[in-house]
């Protein structure tokens, strides 16, 4: 045999010599090949061991990674097509007008006041004539839900039509919010909700007077209310269902009304006067004009009678930057103090009062905060009130399950959480509570004087 042929065959098959020691990389490759082979055989062998595997629906869908551009585009397009289809299934204005015409045509006398009524038989007739889009509304369940005490077994046409309108609005709003749900998981992140509200501003006549430079502050003010109350665990996202279920979106969309009263605007957190008020307070507190609030600056909030002990806890527990509070953190603080009856606000304040992080307030916690109230009373020339008396009053008001501990749930259940927290953190609030009987008597005297005049 020609030595050239032998050498050529040897170079072409370097691993044929059984005496040759394999390299570390070759051993790893061989091990991986064997693992892949045996794993595939094992997996294939187990695939059909349980027939139920075929009927269990898939419940996990992996989201495309950032580098999977095609999958992301496919997901976005499919969601857009799905939402467009859902939108087309909703009643438009013309179809709603036609529905109202059919309901009015099939009303059954006598009317109740000015309310037109319809019985179940005609209700079903209207459902047949109204078209397939309306079929979901013309069910026995809906009729029974709206049936009250009418002796003829009828329902109010107006109530039914309002029900349909509300359902259509909810579905429209859900579709609108879902367009901003980037992940497609049924919730909105803070940035998603910010984009939604920012694009909503031009459609709200009551916000026409806002300068564009203020838009970012307005959006921050609006979004914080949603997240403060609907995201108590601070996960950074809110379910779209929760947004629809609460009244905040109604309050926001109320600003579409060009003739909204001044009183309604003042009580609506999302109105321009309210947003400007909150931001104006922040600017007034910011004496050094650095865009942040120090503890000393925040101490002038409201009546400037909050205790230093409470303010210390605010800056210990809340997110700060070099010991100063930004506007977003300030908004949480304001929402908590202005809504002390709400569970989310009580949760915020309770965390500050729970200095030992035990999940409850004991006599030590109450005394720790009330001593600061007593010190302020001395500074203002008032006689300090006995802590023992105040402690007994607090436990009497709350009536906790454990007679020595007050939990957050105890505060919420008692409906006295706002009073208890005010007593412990604000001298003016404590003074108002302590003199409540005199203040009530004074109000009665003033009202009597007005009646006499």
From Swiss-Prot:
Knockout consequences: Mice display a reduction in the number of mature B-cells and an impaired B-cell proliferation upon B-Cell receptor cross-linking probably due to a loss of inhibition of BCR-induced apoptosis. PPP2R3C overexpression protects B-cells from activation-induced cell death.
Pfam families documented for this protein: EF-hand_13
One cellular component (GO) term of this entry: cytosol
SS bonds (residue pairs): none
Domain EF-hand, residue spans: 273-308, 341-376
Domain of life, source organism: Eukaryota
GO molecular-function term, one example from the UniProt record: metal ion binding
Induction notes from the record: Up-regulated upon B-cell receptor cross-linking.
Function, as annotated: May regulate MCM3AP phosphorylation through phosphatase recruitment. May act as a negative regulator of ABCB1 expression and function through the dephosphorylation of ABCB1 by TFPI2/PPP2R3C complex. May play a role in the activation-induced cell death of B-cells.
Quaternary structure annotation from Swiss-Prot or TrEMBL: Interacts with MCM3AP/GANP, PPP5C, and the phosphatase 2A core enzyme composed of the PPP2CA catalytic subunit and the constant regulatory subunit PPP2R1A. Finds in a complex with ABCB1, TFPI2 and PPP2R3C; leading to the dephosphorylation of ABCB1.
Name of the featured protein: Serine/threonine-protein phosphatase 2A regulatory subunit B'' subunit gamma
């Amino acid at each position: 045999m020609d030595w050239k042929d032998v050498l050529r065959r040897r170079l072409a098959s370097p691993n044929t010599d059984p005496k040759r020691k394999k390299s570390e990389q070759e051993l790893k490759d061989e091990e991986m090949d064997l693992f892949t082979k045996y794993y595939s055989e094992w997996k294939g062998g187990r695939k059909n061991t349980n027939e139920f595997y075929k009927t269990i629906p898939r419940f996990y869908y992996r989201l495309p990674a950032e580098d999977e551009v095609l999958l992301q585009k496919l997901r976005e397009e499919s969601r857009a097509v799905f939402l467009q289809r859902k939108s087309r299934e909703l009643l438009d204005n013309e179809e709603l007008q036609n529905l109202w015409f059919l309901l009015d045509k099939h009303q059954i006398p006598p009317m109740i006041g000015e309310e037109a009524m319809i019985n179940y038989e005609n209700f079903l007739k209207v459902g047949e004539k109204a078209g397939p889009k309306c079929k979901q509304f013309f069910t026995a369940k809906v009729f029974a839900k709206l049936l009250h005490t009418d002796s003829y077994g009828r329902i109010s046409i107006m109530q039914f039509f309002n029900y349909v309108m509300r359902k259509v609005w909810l579905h429209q709003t859900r579709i609108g919010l879902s367009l901003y749900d980037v992940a497609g998981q049924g919730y909105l992140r803070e940035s998603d909700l910010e984009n939604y509200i920012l694009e909503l501003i031009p459609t709200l006549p009551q916000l026409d007077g806002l300068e564009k430079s203020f838009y970012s502050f307005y959006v921050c003010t609006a979004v914080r209310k949603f997240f403060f109350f609907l995201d108590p665990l601070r996960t950074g996202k809110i379910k779209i269902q929760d947004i629809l279920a609460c009244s905040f979106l109604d309050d926001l969309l109320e600003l579409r009304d060009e003739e909204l009263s001044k009183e309604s605007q003042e009580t609506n957190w999302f109105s321009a006067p309210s947003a400007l008020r909150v931001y104006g307070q922040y600017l007034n507190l910011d004496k050094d004009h650095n865009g942040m609030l120090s503890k000393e600056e925040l101490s002038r909030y409201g009546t400037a009678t909050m205790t230093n002990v409470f303010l210390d806890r605010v800056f210990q527990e809340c997110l700060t930057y070099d010991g100063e509070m930004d506007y977003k953190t300030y908004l949480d603080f304001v929402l908590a103090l202005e809504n002390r009856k709400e569970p989310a606000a009580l949760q915020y304040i309770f965390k500050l009062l729970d200095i030992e992080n035990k999940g409850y307030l004991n006599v030590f916690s109450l005394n720790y905060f009330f001593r600061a109230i007593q010190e302020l009373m001395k500074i203002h020339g008032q006689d300090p009130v006995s802590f023992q008396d105040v402690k007994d009053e607090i436990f009497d008001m709350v009536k906790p399950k454990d007679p020595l501990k007050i939990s957050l749930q105890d505060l919420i259940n008692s409906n006295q959480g706002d009073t208890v927290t005010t007593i412990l953190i604000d001298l003016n609030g404590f003074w108002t509570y302590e003199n409540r009987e005199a203040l009530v008597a004074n109000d009665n005297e003033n009202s009597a004087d007005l009646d006499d005049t």
